[in-house]
């Protein structure tokens, strides 16, 4: 199985590293516009093989999309990173043209591929990729919810002092500081609601920390995070290539689900060999429904900035 990652920056390279190390794909191609950059990252990752024991073929290319031919999954990380103080909305004008061009180029050589969008603002870039390519909605997936849910589980783990892998929790809604919705009511530790262990005040603090998780790291690092985002992409790609049918929160195109239409937004999905196999309907309470509707309105508002690009 072959995976192409467009954009060999921190997130793209980390994704390639995790996919290779875990043997998720037999071949990974890193592509970047900067001369020699993807080649260098690929060579560095390849030189880990003897110490970490993987056999994945990793190669890098400079803007040569012919080398990506036959990719089962294409991951788009291209775009400028989020800078301190920069909103996701401000990224739209810069990144939209990049994502559109990349999506069109990869489809020339991999017409049957599934595209995973990582570029920010992620929900809007996912919507752009869908509309610009005309692909079936199951083949365009935004990664955001997988990362947000991972951060939510991590903060719950810290609050509980229990292993994160024993915690089930999900974030839906837009992939933004004010639009994501950590579902504290449904979070559990080994099947037991976390509300039995944590007070409402602590749960609200966990939710708040989750919502600003990306911004917190941007402030600390001076740029966007990359380890957790890269690992989250690899987790999603694994479920696609190996038809694992995991339920993962992803930004996908909705047509009536959760009362919304004509946007890409984070909802629980079954992810398998066909991409989005199913959108899972969770019975939200009235407060959660209101938050989701508000989140959808915010995402829809950002999409308005795409009108001049999609004409």
From Swiss-Prot:
SUPFAM superfamilies: LDH C-terminal domain-like, NAD(P)-binding Rossmann-fold domains. InterPro entries: L-lactate/malate_DH, Lactate/malate_DH_C, Lactate/malate_DH_N, Lactate_DH/Glyco_Ohase_4_C, Malate_DH_type3, NAD(P)-bd_dom_sf. GO terms for biological process: lactate metabolic process; tricarboxylic acid cycle. Its EC number is 1.1.1.37. NAD(+) binds at residues 7-12, 32, 95, 118-120. The keyword Oxidoreductase applies. It comes from the Bacteria. Gene3D superfamilies: Lactate dehydrogenase/glycoside hydrolase, family 4, C-terminal (3.90.110.10), NAD(P)-binding Rossmann-like Domain (3.40.50.720). Signal peptide: none annotated. It catalyses: (S)-malate + NAD(+) = oxaloacetate + NADH + H(+). It is an enzyme of class 1 (oxidoreductase). Keywords: NAD, Oxidoreductase, Tricarboxylic acid cycle. GO terms for molecular function: L-lactate dehydrogenase activity; L-malate dehydrogenase (NAD+) activity. Substrate binds at residues 82, 88, 120, 151. The active site is at residue 175. It holds the Pfam family Ldh_1_C. Belongs to the LDH/MDH superfamily. MDH type 3 family. HAMAP family: Malate_dehydrog_3. PANTHER family: L-2-HYDROXYCARBOXYLATE DEHYDROGENASE (NAD(P)(+)), L-LACTATE DEHYDROGENASE. Catalyzes the reversible oxidation of malate to oxaloacetate. This is Malate dehydrogenase. It comes from Flavobacterium johnsoniae (strain ATCC 17061 / DSM 2064 / JCM 8514 / BCRC 14874 / CCUG 350202 / NBRC 14942 / NCIMB 11054 / UW101).
